[in-house]
C-alpha cells in the first residue's frame, strides 16, 4: 500500500501542475470521477474545459516532454500494475468540454500506458474527431489516418494500446493508406459509439476491463479486411455486345434467259341497250404462268456463284391477270372454267339489264423480252382489242379497254383448293361509263352488289365453249431475294395469240377467228425485273392503284394506262398516259399494265401449272377432232418454243 500511495501522490501532483499550466480564465466547471486502480482504490480527478486548438497543441507538446520524468518514477513492477484508463469525450456535440477522467469504457480493455503524461494527452480532445486524434498515438501521421477510419470499434482498439512501443507499430501499419481511401468518413461523426462510452462510469465494469486478453489480440482487428472488401465493385462487360453488327451481302447477276411467261387478259365489250344507252360487258381469256423446267436456268437466274445458299435462289414470275368479276349465281354448267380446284375465275356477263348483240373483239399479244434482276419481276403487257369485220364499235368501247385487273399467282401444290390473291384497279373512265365501282379486299374478293337479277338472266343466255390446257413443269428449289439491281434483256420471237369473240352471235365471226388470221395483230409483252425489297405503287393520271400484302404471297402493285391507235391491226407499242376523256371514234385500244413483286413464292415439289381457257367462235373447233388437234398443235408449238420439257394435257370441254 505504501508503494501505491507513493506513486499516486506524485501522479496527482503532476496532473494538478499540468492542469494549472494549461488552464485559462474561461475554464471553471469541474467534477470528480473515480480513479480505479488495481486495488480498487478511488482518487478524485478533475474535469475542465479546454482552450483553443493552438493551446491544445501546446499542451500536447508539454506532455510529451514530461514522459521521461514519469517513466523514471515508475518501476518495472508498478508498470505492470499501472492504471488502465483512456480518455473519451463527455459530450459528442461539444467542442470544448473535455474530461480528465481515468475511467476506461471501451469494448476492449487493456493495460494502461506507463506514461502519465500520455493520459493527460488523451484528455484534451475538443470533439469527437479530435478525441480520436488525441487517443491514438502521439505521432501525427497515425492520428490523421485514424480520423477518417469508418469503423468506431477499431478506434477503441487503438486507444487501448498497452505500450508506447505498440502505438508506434500502429502508426507504421500499411492500413492507413487504405483507411484514407474509405468512402465513408462521415460515419465517424454520426457513430453512436462515443455516447455509449461516456455513460458507463461503474468501477466494477472497470475491473472487468482490466482482465482483457493480451495485446496481441488487439492487433487482429477485422476492420481493415472489411475496408478492403468495400473497395471491390463489379465490372460490367456489356460493351462487347453493343459492338456486334450484322453485315448484309449483296450479289449482282446479269444473264440472258428465254421467256417463260404468258399473260391473262380480259376483253371488255360493248352491249347496246334498246334505249341506245351504252352498257359495258366483259368476257375473259385467262392463262397462267408458263414455267421453264430446266433447273440450270433458275440456278443462273438470280445468283453469280455456286454456293449452296445461292443454288436455292430461283425465280417466281407473276402472271398478269385481267378478268371481270365472278358472279356468284353462275352455275358450274354456265361457267367456262374447266377446273374449279384451280381457283381460276372466268365468266362472261353483261352489266346491263337489256340483252343485245355485243360487239366482237380479238386479243393478240406477244412476249418480246424479259428483264431480270435479283429475283424480282416486273411485267409489262400490252393488249390489243381489234374490231371484228361487220361490227360497228361505239365510242365508249375504247374506254371499256380500261379493265378490271386481277393478279394470279401459283399456289403451293399442297393446297387442295388454292386461293389466288387478287387486286382490283378500276379506271375512272369506266365509272363514268356506267360500270359500278369494284371493291378490293386482301382476300381478293370483289363486291358485286350492283349486279341485278335481270342481269343474271342476260348472263345465263350467253353461250360459250371452252377448252382447258394444263402445262406442268419440274419442281423448283427454294426462292430467295437479293438487293442489287441488274438488268438483262432477251428477245423472244413468236406469238401466242388467243382469239375470243364475246356474245351469243359467234357464228358471224367464225371465219374471222380462224387460226390462219391470228398473226394479223400482235403486240409485245415486256417482262422486267428490278431489285426491290418492298412493293412499289406507280401512279398515272386517271388510274386507281392498289397494293396489298398477305402471308402466303409477296407484296406487289399494279396500275394500268391506255393508248389509242388506228384501226390497222398492226399496232406499234406506244406508252401514253390515259386521258380522262374517251377518244371520238376509236376502233382499237391498247392497255399496258405493270406488276412488280418480290419473288419469294415456293411452288413446291410438284411444280407449277398453267391453266388456259380458250373461247372459240364455233363449237366445232373443240368437238371435231381435226379442229381440236389443230388447236392443240398450235399451242404445243408456241409453248415448246419456249420450254422444251413442257407437258400438255387436254382437260375437258364444256358446253354452255
Curated annotation (Swiss-Prot):
Q: Where is this region: Approximate repeats?
A: 180-227
List GO terms (cellular component aspect): apical plasma membrane; basal plasma membrane; basolateral plasma membrane; cytosol; extracellular region; microvillus membrane; mitochondrial outer membrane
Q: Where in the cell is it found?
A: Secreted; Apical cell membrane; Basolateral cell membrane; Cell projection, Microvillus membrane
Q: What is this protein called?
A: Mucin-20
Please list which residues make up the signal peptide. 1-21
Q: What's its job?
A: May regulate MET signaling cascade. Seems to decrease hepatocyte growth factor (HGF)-induced transient MAPK activation. Blocks GRB2 recruitment to MET thus suppressing the GRB2-RAS pathway. Inhibits HGF-induced proliferation of MMP1 and MMP9 expression.
Which tissues is this protein detected in according to the database?
Highly expressed in kidney. Up-regulated in renal tissues during renal injury.
Where is this chain compositionally biased, Polar residues type?
Answer: 85-96, 114-125, 159-170, 560-573
Spans of the sequence repeats?
180-188, 189-197, 198-206, 210-218, 219-227
Q: Where is the composition biased (Low complexity)?
A: 171-227
Where does the record place a coiled coil?
none
What is the gene called?
A: Muc20
Q: Which organism is it from?
A: Mus musculus
The reply on keyword Kinase is no
Keyword terms, alphabetized: Cell membrane, Cell projection, Glycoprotein, Membrane, Repeat, Secreted, Signal
Task: List the glycosylation sites.
Answer: 366, 570
The record's region (Interaction with MET) falls at 604-656
